[in-house]
């Protein structure tokens, strides 16, 4: 450590370093070693929840706990403290006549933030709080910086996101939110594994962006002297596995899109994609409903959920509506009759729908109408199906009306939560769609995909009829934890330097 760094330390940091050195001089490692616990705070509270002070005294049971010192009070020969572990907090009752003199000195000199191990009798105070009456204390690790203000936690948003470790220490609500996220993902895995799906891993580095309409991050591979992109989806590699005969696969992983940031978008995020051979979009619709309802039940229990004051009936069957019917219901404009692109553009101008240069078909106009007028009305879980071919380059055409595809998106609280379709398995049609996307890219559509010839070649070997699905894990977590910004469900959201 440089002298310059020492000079920058504040008084509290200097005192903590002096205590660190004092521990070392006593032969105590300031940063400790392994420690065996017999229970955590939650296990103790559950085990002894119905025991009175007198009953606990009769039981005379001991426990060994460990955690971070969060509060400490007292003077003379008696002290109280709270120890925080992964499950919560437990109170400590420390008397000088119950521990050794050296042990009591460890307690007296311990700072908030230090880690200690405690062995002692399980008791209940006169105030009724379950506590550990210490008989032995072990110093485990020294905290060289003071914690955030202990009663209110962090309040500065920038610090919360940049220093998530401090947020987790001081804000139990935030800590529990991320535990819920992990449990939600585990339950999704459990659900799919129970349906005989196989979890797989596919590359993050791609030669060509594909599988979604999004702008990629470009990087460079030095050894091969080639530019590569970070994946914007896992779709095309997963469908190659269907070609290879795996039949039921899924992947949960990070996706990277070089686009804007807002309350529901981060440049890197987590998605799950699922593919099932011999299935269509209706089968996948049922699967999607099952995944989300199972995850919701696992972390929120039965019944509807509350999201920002709105009751979401996530436990009931999801509404299903064709995109054209949804547009007609909201705007009165009917796109079922066939029309020219000029007629569609005239309707768009009449309704003041923003138009882009690459909107060269009726399908583009239909999609624009939907985004402009319908999305904001979809509060309860709703499957919108029948997207136009022009905006669905990887979806199979509907056999009864080839202007549309067997595709759906799931909307809840006006936001998209899932995208799925009967997969296009005709390599000739797929190449034609890729070429149309490449043309749109030339016309200024930054989100249009290029041509993935390797994927087309894979399809030429034959892919069975297949249904595929993508779900945004982060948005689903936002819904199930009642949060309004994606940064609150990402442990380390993207931040400016």
From Swiss-Prot:
Subcellular compartments: Cytoplasm
Which positions in this protein are listed as binding Mg(2+) 1? 409, 416
Cofactor or coenzyme needed: Mg(2+)
According to UniProt, the reaction catalysed is: tRNA(Lys) + L-lysine + ATP = L-lysyl-tRNA(Lys) + AMP + diphosphate
- Broadest EC class assigned to this enzyme: ligase
Ranges in coiled-coil conformation? none
HAMAP family recorded: Lys_tRNA_synth_class2
PANTHER family hit by this protein: LYSINE--TRNA LIGASE, CHLOROPLASTIC_MITOCHONDRIAL, LYSYL-TRNA SYNTHETASE
Q: By what name is this protein known?
A: Lysine--tRNA ligase
**What gene is this protein a product of?**
lysS
């Amino acid at each position: 450590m440089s002298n310059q760094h020492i000079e920058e330390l504040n008084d509290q940091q200097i005192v903590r370093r002096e205590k660190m050195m004092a521990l070392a001089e006593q032969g105590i490692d300031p940063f400790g070693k392994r420690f065996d616990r017999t229970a955590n705070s939650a296990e103790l509270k559950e085990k002894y929840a119905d025991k009175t002070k007198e009953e606990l005294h009769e039981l005379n049971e001991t426990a060994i706990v460990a955690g971070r010192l969060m509060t400490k009070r007292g003077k003379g020969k008696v002290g109280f403290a709270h120890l925080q572990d992964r499950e919560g907090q437990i109170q400590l009752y420390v008397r000088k006549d119950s521990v050794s003199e050296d042990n009591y000195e460890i307690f007296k000199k311990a700072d908030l933030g230090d880690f200690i191990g405690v062995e002692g009798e399980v008791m209940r105070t006169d105030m009724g709080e379950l506590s550990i009456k210490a008989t032995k204390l072990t110093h485990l690790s020294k905290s060289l910086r003071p914690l955030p203000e202990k009663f209110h936690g962090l309040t500065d948003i920038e610090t919360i996101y940049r220093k998530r470790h401090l947020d987790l220490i001081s804000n139990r609500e935030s800590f529990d939110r991320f535990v819920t996220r992990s449990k939600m993902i585990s339950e999704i895995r459990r659900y799919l594994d129970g349906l005989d799906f196989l979890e797989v891993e596919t590359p993050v580095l791609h030669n060509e962006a594909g599988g979604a309409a999004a702008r990629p991050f470009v990087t460079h591979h030095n050894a091969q002297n080639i530019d590569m992109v970070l994946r914007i989806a896992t779709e095309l590699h997963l469908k190659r596995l269907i070609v290879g005969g795996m039949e039921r696969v899924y992947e949960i992983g990070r996706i990277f899109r070089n686009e804007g940031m807002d309350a529901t978008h981060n440049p890197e995020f987590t998605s799950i994609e699922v593919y099932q051979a011999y299935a269509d979009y209706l089968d996948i619709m049922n699967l999607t409903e099952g995944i989300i309802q199972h995850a919701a039940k696992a972390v929120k229990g039965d019944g509807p959920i509350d999201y920002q004051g709105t009751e979401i009936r996530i436990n009931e069957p999801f509404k299903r509506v064709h995109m054209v019917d949804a547009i007609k219901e909201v705007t009165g404009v009917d796109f079922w009759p066939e029309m020219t692109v000029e007629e569609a553009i005239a309707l768009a101008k009449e309704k003041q729908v923003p138009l882009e240069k690459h909107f060269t078909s009726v399908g583009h106009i239909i999609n624009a109408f939907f985004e402009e007028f319908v999305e904001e009305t979809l509060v309860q879980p709703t499957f919108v199906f029948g997207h136009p071919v022009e905006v669905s380059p990887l979806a199979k055409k509907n056999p009864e009306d080839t202007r549309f595809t067997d595709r759906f998106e799931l909307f809840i609280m006006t936001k998209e939560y899932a995208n799925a379709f009967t997969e296009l398995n005709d390599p000739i049609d797929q190449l034609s769609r890729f070429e149309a996307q490449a043309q749109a890219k030339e016309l200024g559509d930054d989100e249009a995909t290029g041509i993935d010839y390797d994927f087309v070649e894979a399809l030429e070997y034959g892919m069975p009829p297949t249904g595929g699905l993508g779900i945004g894990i982060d948005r689903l977590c936002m819904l199930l934890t009642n949060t309004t910004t994606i940064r609150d469900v990402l442990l380390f959201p993207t931040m400016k330097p």
